[in-house]
Every structure is written in C-alpha cells, then in structure tokens.
Amino acid sequence: MMEAIKKKMQMLKLDKENALDRAEQAEAEQKQAEERSKQLEDELAAMQKKLKGTEDELDKYSEALKDAQEKLELAEKKAADAEAEVASLNRRIQLVEEELDRAQERLATALQKLEEAEKAADESERGMKVIENRALKDEEKMELQEIQLKEAKHIAEEADRKYEEVARKLVIIEGDLERTEERAELAESKCSELEEELKNVTNNLKSLEAQAEKYSQKEDKYEEEIKILTDKLKEAETRAEFAERSVAKLEKTIDDLEDELYAQKLKYKAISEELDHALNDMTSI
C-alpha cells in the first residue's frame, strides 16, 4: 500500500513538475509573442508614417508643377502683348513716315515757288536797269519810263510780298518739318527701345521655355518618383496587411497560449489538491 502511494506521489510530483515546466514555457512563449506583436505594431506605425510623408511630398511636387505652368502661361501672355504693341508701333511709324513724305513734298513745292519768286525779282531788277538806261538815253520817254518804273516797282513789291509770304510759309513748313523730324526721331527712339524690350522679352521667353523644358524634365522625374513611391506604397500596404494578419495570428496564438496556461494552472491546481489529499491520507495512516 505504501509502495503504491509513494509511486503515485512520485507520479503526481513528476506531473506537477511537468505542468510547471509547460506553464513556464507557455509564459515564455506568451512573452515572446507579445514582444513580436509589439514589434510588428511599431513597424506598422513606421510604415504608416512613411506613407504619410510620401503623400505630403507628392502634394508638394504637384504644387510646384502647377506654379511652373502658371508662370509659363504668364510669360506667353506677356510675349503676345509685346508683339501686339510692336505691331501697333510699326503702324504708327509708317503713318509718321507718310506724314514726313508729305511734308517734304510741301517743302519742295515751297522751294520751287521761292525760286520762281527770285527769278521774277531778278527779271524786275533787270527791267529796272533797262528802264534806267533808256531814261538816260532818251529823256523824251521819261514819262513812259516812270510808268514802267512804277510797274516794275509794283512787280518788285509784289515779288517781295510773294517772297515774304513764301519765306513765311517756308518757316512754317520748316517748323512743321522740324517737329515731324523730332516726332520721327522720337518714334525711332521708341521703336529702338521697343525692339530692345522685345529682344529682352524674347530672351526671357527663351529662358522661360528652357525653364519649361526643365520643369517638363522634372515633371517626368516626379512622375517616375511618383510611380516608384506608388509601388513602394503598394508594397507597404501589402506589408501592412501581412503585418496585420501576423498580428491577428499572434493575438490568436497568445489567446491560445493563455487558454493553455489557464488549463495548465487548473491542472496544476487539481494535481496539487490530489497531492494534498494523498499527503493527508498518508498522515492519517
């Protein structure tokens, strides 16, 4: 009887030790599972943070591309406005040149009339000399000569009046011509300034076109980076899904281990109670 009890006690003790070992092992596995679960949760949080940074960077690249497109459109509008202004100034220059041609024609006409007046004055002067010579030679024709002299003076006065009128008109024409030339010079100066401005605008436009090409290359680069980031995003999402499944699996494993630990504790409690009963029985014997 004692031998059977001792053997049973040894078996109970061995079962107790095995139960303690399994309980300790279950607790160790539970701790490892919890640590692995926390590690996966940290990795998932890091991936989500990295994903948020990638989305912010993508928004920044999109905004930079939008600003570049707006600047290019503004440069094209300025170039178009400059070309329209140059065309308008070319038309104004053409009108000024036509007005200058008309002024030169009026000046040529005035000079011709002045030349005719000078010829008439010369002829009058020669007539006066002829009359004076005839007066010296023939006193009898004095009255006729005086009449001719008066006529000559009248012609001379008329010629002088015409000359003064022509001279006055010439001064006016010269003033008009001078003002026209000043306007033409001003127009030429303005045209030169506008040509220089157009040249600068053209250079700026070329620079903007180069920038646009550069922005286009950057856009291609950004698109490539976006594609890479999209692939990384998909990969991160896949890893996140896998991590979530792993966490769920580990949580289930932890639950199973906790259930097993609880069962082992119950079994240990039952063995302890059975061992206590056996010891009590031995004490009673």
UniProtKB/Swiss-Prot annotation:
In-chain residues carrying the UniProt-annotated modification Phosphoserine: S62, S88, S207, S216, S272, S284
Locations listed in the record: Cytoplasm, Cytoskeleton
Positions of modified residues (Phosphothreonine): T54, T109, T253, T283
Region annotation Disordered: where it falls in the sequence: 16-44
Phosphotyrosine carried by residues: Y262
Gene Ontology terms, MF aspect: actin filament binding
Pfam family, one: Tropomyosin
Coiled-coil boundaries: 1-285
Keyword Cytoplasm set for record: yes
Main location: cytoplasm
Documented effect of changing T253K: Found in patients with undefined congenital myopathy; likely pathogenic
Keyword flag NAD: no
Modified sites of kind N-acetylmethionine: M2
Keywords assigned by UniProt, alphabetized: Acetylation, Actin-binding, Chromosomal rearrangement, Coiled coil, Cytoplasm, Cytoskeleton, Disease variant, Muscle protein, Nemaline myopathy, Phosphoprotein, Proto-oncogene
Compositional bias of kind Basic and acidic residues: 16-41
Effect of R91C: Found in patients with undefined congenital myopathy; likely pathogenic
Gene Ontology cellular component terms for the protein in this record: actin cytoskeleton; actin filament; cytoskeleton; cytosol; extracellular exosome; mitochondrion; muscle thin filament tropomyosin; stress fiber
Clinical disorder: Congenital myopathy 4A, autosomal dominant: A muscular disorder characterized by onset of muscle weakness in infancy or childhood. Most affected individuals show mildly delayed motor development, hypotonia, generalized muscle weakness, and weakness of the proximal limb muscles and neck muscles, resulting in difficulty running and easy fatigability. Many patients have respiratory insufficiency with reduced vital capacity. Skeletal muscle biopsy shows nemaline rod inclusions, subsarcolemmal 'cap' structures, and fiber-type disproportion. Congenital myopathy 4B, autosomal recessive: A muscular disorder characterized by muscle weakness appearing in infancy or early childhood. Most affected individuals show congenital contractures, delayed motor development, hypotonia, respiratory insufficiency, generalized muscle weakness, and weakness of the proximal limb muscles and neck muscles, resulting in difficulty walking or inability to walk. Skeletal muscle biopsy shows variable histologic findings, including nemaline rods, type 1 fiber predomination, and centralized nuclei.
Oligomeric form and interacting partners: Homodimer. Heterodimer of an alpha (TPM1, TPM3 or TPM4) and a beta (TPM2) chain. Interacts with TMOD1. Interacts with TNNT1.
Function, as annotated: Binds to actin filaments in muscle and non-muscle cells. Plays a central role, in association with the troponin complex, in the calcium dependent regulation of vertebrate striated muscle contraction. Smooth muscle contraction is regulated by interaction with caldesmon. In non-muscle cells is implicated in stabilizing cytoskeleton actin filaments.
Family: Belongs to the tropomyosin family.
Domain-level remarks: The molecule is in a coiled coil structure that is formed by 2 polypeptide chains. The sequence exhibits a prominent seven-residues periodicity.
Protein name: Tropomyosin alpha-3 chain
Organism field: Homo sapiens
